[in-house]
């Protein structure tokens, strides 16, 4: 997805990120960076981030682009590491694929990555705080990718569409937590019927103009909703509906192919 290069206007930041706290320096070219910042969009909450770098790469060159990895319910910034991101990035380097970084960030246990009635807005945290922070660290954020698991799969679709086709290089939604109705949604996923309607990803024009990949197991509880979502797209997305459930085992087996797709 990062081969789709173009000169793009940078996003306008509505709130500059608070100073981040980088981890202690390790090797000359570390494969992992960690830190945190206080997110105004999340109500002043300390927000941790983790960056997985492909071996031999660094952000300072200004050419490394990020894929934002959004965790599922009750997860955190480290979920992408549990899914095997570092091993998959190393494999891409061995195969000579274009390198990119994968960035995990805390979004809240049950936030569903959109503005809530409480005022907390993890989506704004990603777009208005995290992306400018990554830019200040030397990453090329003119175009970024999104991927996510479960709640984060929905979030990847939601935030990728919100950022728009000019900035979003690709979206990979893995076992996305999609609901065919408000009454079918999990308690706490949306604040009200109006909240569900306003933040639905079905029928969004932007998602027909952004490269998409959707993977979901046939035994996943979100299988039918994911099928319905895919069926209403103008162009069939990449990905597959294959044997598997809503679990880390399925996500680990799918990740190498998903990151290889992001690299194309």
What function would you assign to each model-found segment?
Residues 2-264:
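Non-catalytic cap/lid and distal C-terminal segments of serine-dependent acyl enzymes
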């Amino acid at each position: 997805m990062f081969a789709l290069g173009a000169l793009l206007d940078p996003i306008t930041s509505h709130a500059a990120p608070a100073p981040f706290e980088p981890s202690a320096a390790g090797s000359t070219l570390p494969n992992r960076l960690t830190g945190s910042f206080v997110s105004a969009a999340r109500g002043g909450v300390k927000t941790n981030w983790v960056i997985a770098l492909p071996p031999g790469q660094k952000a300072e060159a200004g050419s490394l682009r990020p894929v934002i990895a959004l965790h599922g319910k009750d997860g955190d910034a480290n979920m992408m590491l549990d899914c095997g991101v570092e091993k998959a990035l190393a494999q891409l380097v061995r195969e000579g694929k274009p390198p990119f970084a994968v960035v995990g960030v805390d979004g809240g246990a049950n936030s569903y990555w959109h503005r809530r009635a409480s005022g907390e807005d993890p989506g704004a945290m990603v777009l208005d705080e995290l992306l400018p922070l990554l830019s200040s660290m030397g990453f090329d954020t003119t175009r970024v990718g999104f991927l996510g698991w479960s709640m984060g799969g929905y979030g990847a679709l939601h935030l990728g569409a919100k950022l728009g086709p000019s900035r979003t290089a690709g979206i990979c939604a893995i076992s996305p937590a999609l609901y065919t109705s408000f009454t079918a949604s999990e308690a706490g996923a949306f604040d009200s019927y109006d909240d569900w309607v306003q933040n639905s990803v079905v029928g969004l024009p932007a998602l027909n103009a952004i490269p998409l990949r959707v993977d979901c197991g046939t035994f996943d509880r979100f299988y039918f909703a994911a099928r319905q979502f895919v069926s209403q797209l103008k162009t069939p997305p990449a990905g597959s509906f294959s044997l598997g459930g809503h679990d880390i085992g399925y996500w680990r087996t799918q990740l190498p192919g998903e990151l290889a797709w992001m690299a194309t």
